[in-house]
Amino acid sequence: MDEQERQRLIKEEEKNTKRLRFLVDLTTSVLYQDHTLTLEEARTMVRNTEKAILAMFPDKQQTFDIVLRPRFERILHERWGAGVSGLVH
């Protein structure tokens, strides 16, 4: 791999990382702040967020399950008293 290709891959990874942060922050904000959101809609939002993240980082399912799923689980439990157990992996 030449230096130009290496730099391109680094920039792509940085772009995906920024998108990941934005997506997680946006999802977290909506889950906390949209008082019209139902539990099922929230679960769907988490499921769609997971799909989007795994499309950017296909080999990171375990990381999602360890780092982000508990975060979303906590939010859903705080808001609705139920977690993401209705999610299909």
List the predicted regions and their residue ranges:
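Surface-exposed peri-terminal alpha-helical interaction modules
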Residues: 1-89
